[in-house]
């Protein structure tokens, strides 16, 4: 396994604007691998589809198009072309118990992208599949009136029996997530 580090798109933008400070181009065709970054999104518990025993329906709002807070830009046409890539992907999560003075028994919560190094120095990701985005995920670009942005939205399912993920989503109704973007071409 190669040494990888999870990078948010803000980290990538910060690197190019504050550290690298020169024009550059990236092409997955030349390197043989895409550049993978995380973007922030939301997942909502969706009570509208109760026809799947053992599967909790969820609705995910992932990245938005056009100019981002960090100065990066994802064109609508690029996002539209990438919509099919959401199908048949796992929903990953890392869950841990949080105890507080007010709640010494603890409560299960989602955590961030936990990872550790194995004995060979390779990065091992501690997240595990907690659900699936099926082929019928209804991936589409949707304008969010409140946020005044167009987001990629998909439907998925959380496994009810295999983790505490469904319990957390039913309790919280909405949770923050990050979504992987695979960058095949980039210029700065």
Tell where the protein language model's regions lie, with residue ranges:
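Signature of dsDNA virion morphogenesis modules
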Residues: 1-188
């Amino acid at each position: 396994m190669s040494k990888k580090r999870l990078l948010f798109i803000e980290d990538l933008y910060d690197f190019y604007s504050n550290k690298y400070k020169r024009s550059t181009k990236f092409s997955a065709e030349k390197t043989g691998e895409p550049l993978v970054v995380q973007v922030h999104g939301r997942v909502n518990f969706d009570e509208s589809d109760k026809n799947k025993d053992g599967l909790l329906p969820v609705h995910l709002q992932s990245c938005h198009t056009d100019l981002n807070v960090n100065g990066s830009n994802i064109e609508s046409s690029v996002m539209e072309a990438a919509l099919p890539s959401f199908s048949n992907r796992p929903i990953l999560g890392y869950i841990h118990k949080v105890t507080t003075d007010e709640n010494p028994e603890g409560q299960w919560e989602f955590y961030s992208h936990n990872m550790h190094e194995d004995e060979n120095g390779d990065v091992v990701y501690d997240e595990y599949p907690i659900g699936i985005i099926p082929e019928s995920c209804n991936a589409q670009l949707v304008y969010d009136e409140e946020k005044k942005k167009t987001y990629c939205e998909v439907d998925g399912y959380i496994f009810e029996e295999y983790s505490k993920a469904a319990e957390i989503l039913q309790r919280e109704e909405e949770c923050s997530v990050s979504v992987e973007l695979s960058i095949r071409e980039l210029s700065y």
